Amino acid sequence: VAPGDVDYILLTHAHIDHSGNIPLLVKKGFSGEIITTFATADLCDIMLRDSAHIQEFEAEWRNRKARRSGEPEYEPIYTVADADAATKLLAPVDYGQKITLCDGIEVRFNDVGHLLGSASIEVWITEGDVSKKVVFSGDVGNVNQPIIKDPQLVKEADYLVIESTYGDRTHGEDIPDYVGEFTRILRETFQKGGNVVIPSFAVGRTQEILYFIREIKEKNLLPEFPGFEVYVDSPLAIEATNVFNKNVKGCFDEEAMELVNQGINPLLFRGLKTTITSDESRQINFDTKPKVILSASGMCEAGRIRHHLKHNLWRPECTICFVGYQAVGTLGRKLIEGAESVKLFGENITVNARIEVLKGISGHADMNGLLDWIRGFEKIPDRVMVVHGEDTVTDHFAKLVEDTFGCPAFAPYSGGTVDLAANEIITIGQKIPKKSDEKPSKLKSASAFNRLVAAAKRLLNVVYKNEGLANKDMAKFETQIQNLADKWDR
């Protein structure tokens, strides 16, 4: 479907894996309405612009290299102007508000407890004398998360489209003691005179950590360090926290609202400091007092967190505390897997700091949580379509749904189609192959060889740059290259 032919986008929540391509659709001609909740609209307003800034920065960096090598210029996926155009199309609605999109289509958004403003979406469709109801789960939240409500259940649907991020695993039976574990990490680190550096996702996770720290301070759980300071060093996280504070009513859970009604901001406490400018960020590491530093990105792949790692990883008295998932190949994953040294800004940094993982924090319902959410239907849907997961996970969860509830379930591939009126699968779609489907050993081998080829190309460029070198130096350079070739020509 051409973007210009689309009338509406129904957006479940603001996370970039769900909202991030909307400016591209606008760039390609979409001019309809983006229906979502008020909190999601507020978050998208800052997150899409931030994403666009990253796209523009990457394009600028690539093009500096391209101009030097004579390669064609790289165009950003979308620009800040595209993101601004997208945010102007946001049409927010309240939770529980049933609205008519057009003749034959009505929708309602319900809190699904994944992120501030996140929603499942009920869609009523009427064509002729046939009416069907489809429910899209969005990302179903975990229960007992701080700040936001537990997932709200939906009573009925003819069809359910459900996510399966954790459709093949559980978070464990024990209820984690986040505050107790976090207090231990802070105490042990501060006693040694070190900093606790927390790579944290700017939206959602940072606010949860602030909530825990407020509780630690309010309950005086660290009496020996009552005035410790906490730095939030991420402009996006600061903006997102302001959005949380703006969207209290209707989004915060009972416990958080109790605090609000007492005049207490659940995300504010003595010793909280925010840094906007780069100069303010740099000053943090000149302060020798033990402190907490919260900074993005959560997987340490970009952002100011890399500067804080450079200044703290080599210090045995410091702790790097991870509070979110670390994808394979990221710097964060390397650190939690025991890397002895890492490269930051061209410098090898020895890892002497203690590496901790605050386990159990997840914004996603696990396998049992997803099943419980389906149990909330008073009548099980006629068919369940499982999406938003790895292929093996979606297939596993679809079979689990069939075995548990006795209703037909399947995991469609890209382009899969279902006749809703007749409840028939027209096409299952086409599997899009991923490079990650290859065996890890092959991937590593290919990656290593690609780096080797890149190194060889760089060497050739260096040779060309040295045209006109003095004969004596050129002969020396040639000998070094020949010796290297002889060493590996076997």
Positions of PLM-derived features:
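His/Asp/Glu-rich metal-coordinating catalytic cores
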Residues: 1-10, 15, 19, 26-208, ...
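A polyampholytic, Gly/Pro-enriched intrinsically disordered region
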Residues: 55-60, 248-261, 343, 426-451
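Short, compositionally biased "basic patch" segments
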Residues: 146-161, 248-255, 326-352
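Hard-cation-handling environments
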Residues: 183-330, 342-343, 393, 400-404, ...
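Generic long, charged, amphipathic alpha-helical segments
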Residues: 343-374
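Charged, amphipathic alpha-helical linkers/stalks
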Residues: 415-475
